[in-house]
Amino acid sequence: EILKIIEKFLKIHIKNQINSGAEIIQIFDSWAGLLDSKDLDKYIYNPTFSLVEFTKTLDVPVICFPRGIKDYKKYCDIIQPDVICIDYEIDPAQIVKDIKIPVQGGMNPQILLTDKENLKKEAKRYLDIFKDHPYIFNLGHGVLPETNPSMMEYLVKIVKDY
């Protein structure tokens, strides 16, 4: 089965990353949210759990980013990552209620295409929601190519000054 072959090579890659100095591993599954619930065990939960379990045997923490997954709580209960990375389609206030492990991300990168006032308001909203929860500030997906670098600099300042 092709998934087993991919999983085998991912474990080799993870081990090589750790041997080269990686102190944490992040597993991205950018297509997790596109699957029907009946396919999640076979294509998401089982292989991802195997990778997380393997990485933890090497004493390295794991961040998982199942973009678009509908039920983050169930995902965390099954996969047991050390940190869960959320996308911008999920309600951060609900995540704080449902998830006890550290959370990373969530803010929509589109906000960086607006103005400083909107950016500050949205960044502070995330910071306020997660103020009593272990949180790594990050976007809910990558920086868009048309983003003005000065807006990224401003965002970093907002977070550092919080």
Model-derived features: positions:
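Active-site loop segments of alpha/beta catalytic cores
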Residues: E1-Y162
